[in-house]
Amino acid sequence: MKSPREQAIFARPTRRMMVFVDGENLVFRYQNMVNNGFVPRDEMKHEPDVFVWFDGFTHLGQQHEIIRTTYYTYVVGDDLRVTNIRNQLRSMQFSKHMASLLPNTLSPCVFKKDQRSRSGKGVDIQLSVDMMSHVFRGNVDSILLLSCNGDYAPLLDEVKRAGILVYVSAFSDGFSSSLKDRADAVYELDGTTWK
């Protein structure tokens, strides 16, 4: 007979979570840290100015049933490049609870950007709309935001007012204290990223 602890570990999780990845924010913070001398693990998947990913980025969600992980980003280039990036993201996996039966591949939300600029608002707006939509439709019990952008603080306030648990993960570089203050749990991605 299994101990209560073992039963809890192997039981399918009941709390539903969705993960929202501000890929634009993550990739620029990652690149900044690399430029400052940090050495990434060999397993990191990186396309300059487009995405950075490691399946351990969803570490905080492993005790939840992760329904979906949506990766929001921009691409400069033609439609073929946009499709290629979408396919690359769709082929990547996230870590999940060992008893989960759901698929664990990323759901890409890729915006085409015609000019090379540092950032845009399409990612932030779409991520916010999607998060609020899922929260108010009752699709989730918890959310995990991967971003260090303090602009999401009011969004997290609304999510918490709806009774949803809020988890936030980001690189230490520029990790907004206003996000950390609003999160029920915080995880810095540095430990899973650098050698």
Model-inferred region functions:
Residues 2-123, 165:
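Domain-level signal for Mg2+-assisted phosphodiester chemistry and nucleotide/NA-binding surfaces
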Residues 94-195:
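Nuclease catalytic cores that cleave nucleic-acid phosphodiester bonds
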